[in-house]
C-alpha cells in the first residue's frame, strides 16, 4: 500500500453507494484520495465528480456513451470506456482499495480483476457473491485479498464476529426493515404500483435495489452473500424484521451472548469502516443520541407474503449455479416490473419458475 492517503477507485461512483462513498472521502480527505471513478448512465454527474476530485482515470462503462463523452476541466484525467476500462483502472499500481458499487451482475468482472490484481475490496455489489461466491472467495484467498463488506448487515456481522471464534458462533441474524409493504396483506401486494414500490421508508437507494427491498429479494440475496462471505451453513443464518433499521445485524454465540452493531440507517458508516479497516476514524455518519428515547422491534418474517426469502435459503443451500440463475431471473423480472410488464407479485413468482426449471 502507498504511504499517505489511501488511494481509492470507485466502481459505480454515480449510484447511491458511490455518492455516499464520495461524501466519506470529502470528510476524510486527509486519509483518502480518489484515483478513479466509473459511471454508466448519469454522465453529467460523473463529469461533476471528475471535476471535483480530479481522478487519474474516469471510466464510462457504456462504450456508446463514451464515444460522445466530453470531460472539461480535468487536464490530467484519462477517460477510458467499457469493461476493459474498468479492468485497466482497478489494476493500476497506485490503487489500494476498490469500492465495488456497480449494481447487479455487471459488477462482477471489475471486482474479479481487482482481486486478481491484489487490491483490497470494499464490496457493496452483493451480486458478485450471489452469482459466483465460492469462486470469488477462493480467488480472494489465493490472492491474499481482504473482501470487506459494505452492506450494512454484513458489515455488522463482520464486526461482531471479531469478538469470538468461528466454532463459537451459533448463528448470525440478518435484520430487514421489511420494506414499505411489511404490513400489507397478500391481496394488497397484488395492487402495488411502481411508485409504491420505489417509496422505501428507511433507506435511500437506486430503483432496482429499492424494488428488491420491497419484495425482500434484497434480503434473500444477502442470505446467499452471508453464506459465502462468512463460510456459514444455511442453518446458521436467520432473518428478523426490524422496522427501525437501528440494529443492522447480530451474531449469537454458543454461550447465548448476542452481539449487535447499532447506528442510524446511514450507509456512510459501513462504507467508511470498509475503507478505514482495521482502524476507525471520525467521519460524517450520523450518531445515535442515547439520551433520546427510542424503541426497537423485532418480528419473524412472513414467508408466505414474502417468498423471496425461501428462494434465498434454497439457493444458499443448493449452491452451484443457482445463485447466478436467481440473480439473472430477478434482474429481468424487476426490469419487467419497472417497465410495466409484470405485476409486483409476479417478480418473485417468475424467479420461482426459473429456479424450478434449473437443474
How would you label these PLM feature ranges?
Residues 1-359:
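Catalytic, metal-anchored helix/loop core of enzyme active sites in primary metabolism
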Amino acid at each position: 500500500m502507498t504511504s499517505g492517503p489511501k488511494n481509492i477507485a470507485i466502481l459505480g461512483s454515480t449510484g447511491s453507494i458511490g455518492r455516499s462513498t464520495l461524501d466519506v472521502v470529502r470528510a476524510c480527505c486527509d486519509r483518502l484520495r480518489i484515483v478513479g471513478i466509473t459511471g454508466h448512465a448519469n454522465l453529467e454527474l460523473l463529469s461533476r465528480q471528475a471535476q471535483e476530485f480530479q481522478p487519474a482515470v474516469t471510466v464510462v462503462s457504456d462504450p456508446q456513451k463514451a464515444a460522445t463523452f466530453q470531460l472539461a476541466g480535468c487536464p490530467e484525467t484519462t477517460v477510458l470506456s467499457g469493461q476493459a476500462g474498468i479492468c485497466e483502472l482497478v489494476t493500476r499500481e497506485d490503487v489500494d482499495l476498490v469500492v465495488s458499487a456497480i449494481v447487479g451482475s455487471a459488477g462482477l468482472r471489475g471486482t474479479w480483476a481487482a482481486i486478481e490484481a491484489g487490491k483490497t475490496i470494499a464490496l457493496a455489489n452483493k451480486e458478485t457473491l450471489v452469482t459466483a461466491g465460492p469462486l470469488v472467495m477462493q480467488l480472494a484467498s489465493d490472492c491474499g485479498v481482504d473482501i470487506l463488506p459494505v452492506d450494512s448487515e454484513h458489515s455488522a456481522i463482520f464486526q461482531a464476529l471479531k469478538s469470538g471464534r468461528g466454532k463459537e458462533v451459533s448463528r448470525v441474524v440478518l435484520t430487514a426493515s421489511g420494506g414499505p409493504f411489511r404490513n400489507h396483506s397478500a391481496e394488497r401486494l397484488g395492487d402495488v404500483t411502481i411508485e409504491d414500490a420505489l417509496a422505501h421508508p428507511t433507506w435511500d437507494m437506486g430503483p432496482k435495489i429499492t424494488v428488491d427491498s420491497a419484495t425482500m429479494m434484497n434480503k434473500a440475496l444477502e442470505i446467499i452473500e452471508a453464506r459465502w462471505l462468512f463460510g456459514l451453513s444455511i442453518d446458521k443464518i436467520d432473518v428478523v424484521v426490524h422496522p427501525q433499521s437501528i440494529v443492522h445485524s447480530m451474531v449469537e454465540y454458543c454461550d447465548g451472548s448476542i452481539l449487535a452493531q447499532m447506528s442510524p440507517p446511514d450507509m456512510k458508516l459501513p462504507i467508511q469502516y470498509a475503507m478505514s479497516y482495521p482502524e476507525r476514524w471520525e467521519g460524517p455518519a450520523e450518531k445515535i443520541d442515547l439520551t433520546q428515547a427510542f424503541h426497537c422491534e423485532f418480528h419473524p418474517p412472513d414467508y408466505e407474503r414474502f417468498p423471496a426469502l425461501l428462494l434465498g435459503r434454497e439457493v444458499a443451500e443448493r449452491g452451484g449455479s443457482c445463485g447466478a440463475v436467481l440473480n439473472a431471473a430477478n434482474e429481468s423480472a424487476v426490469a419487467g416490473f419497472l417497465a410495466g410488464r409484470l405485476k409486483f407479485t409476479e417478480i418473485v413468482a417468475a424467479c420461482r419458475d426459473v429456479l424450478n426449471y434449473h437443474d
